């Protein structure tokens, strides 16, 4: 937070001749007592192509600064035309009004300045050598460009101005390590499950041929003529459906026999027929 705040700047003599001094009325506010003075400085930008033509018009020290709102008048001399390129004497340029505390700049205000001839004849037919007495300036006071900078004041230390490093990244590293351990545990569990599946698949492969053999034997063998290696009949290997079919056939044969016997008992013999006659 800035201890000194710029509240306003008023350009007093505007427009004015090129050779007239610059006059400003500056208002600022001081929130706390200051140990050092404030340095105000006005700079004229002589060329847009090089900093070598910049001129420091004036600088003053203001202090001691009481707490509250303060106002003062800043007057600076006009720039020297000999230090400005002839092609840029009559043109648009910039002036910079800045303030520093303890050698550190904390605010800068820039204004555009339009330099032109005061006579219409000179504007239409500009001479080779610029007559400075006929050049006037007009500061665009309604459109200033303000830039502020953070500095260390009396009640602030370097440690307070630059906050200490936080320990949050270390906690994040610990959380990342815990996540890595959890991922490793999950991978181990997946490997164990994969090994168990491999074992189960191996056992299934061993028993599979036996099942295939049992399925093939009933098709090639019957209960009456095929014997296994131990001499046992393979009729037992037949399915329950075949046993039921055999039982049904046996019952049909018995029924046929019974019906034949009944018919034989009812029909008379040839001898009996002759006796009735």
Curated annotation (Swiss-Prot):
Q: Where in the cell is it found?
A: Nucleus
- Which GO terms are recorded in the biological process aspect for this UniProt protein? DNA replication-dependent chromatin assembly; nucleosome assembly; nucleosome disassembly
Is Transmembrane given among the entry's keywords?
Answer: no
| Coiled coil location | none
Record-level Gene Ontology MF annotations: histone binding
Predominant cellular place of this UniProt entry's protein: nucleus
Biased region (Acidic residues) positions are: 155-207, 239-265
Where do the segments described as Disordered lie? 154-277
Q: What's any one GO cellular component for it? A: chromatin
- Basic and acidic residues compositional bias, start-end: 219-230
Task: Please provide the record's keywords in A-Z order.
Answer: Chaperone, Chromatin regulator, Nucleus, Transcription, Transcription regulation
Domain of life, per UniProt, equals: Eukaryota
Q: How does it assemble?
A: Interacts with histone H3 and histone H4.
Family listed: Belongs to the ASF1 family.
Q: What is the documented function of this protein?
A: Histone chaperone that facilitates histone deposition and histone exchange and removal during nucleosome assembly and disassembly.
Q: What is the official name of this protein in its record?
A: Histone chaperone ASF1
Organism annotation: Kluyveromyces lactis (strain ATCC 8585 / CBS 2359 / DSM 70799 / NBRC 1267 / NRRL Y-1140 / WM37) (Yeast)
